[in-house]
Amino acid sequence: VKQFTFHLALSQEEIMLIYRGHARRLVVRSEQGLTLELAVEKIRPFVAYNGVYGYFCLKTQDDYRFISLERIN
């Protein structure tokens, strides 16, 4: 299992672009220095009325297949 941590700050306007279909993937830079690409549906459980803000931990299998995403703050 691999773990990657990153901060995410998406405003309500940015989330609306995602919901309107303008983006299917989200690209973030992990604190470990890697560029990570996530399907936007992985962040939906964390969307609030004002957007998505927080510190997250992405867990993947050794071949980088998704296991879980959790907010850790």
Regions of interest found by a model, annotated:
Residues V1-E13, A39-R44:
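Charged, amphipathic alpha-helical segments
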Residues T60-N73:
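Charged low-complexity stretches with an acidic bias
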Residues H7-L10, I18-H22, R65-I67:
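Short acidic/polar alpha-helix capping motifs at helix-coil junctions
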Residues M16-Y53, C57-D62:
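Amphipathic, hydrophobic secondary-structure cores in small proteins
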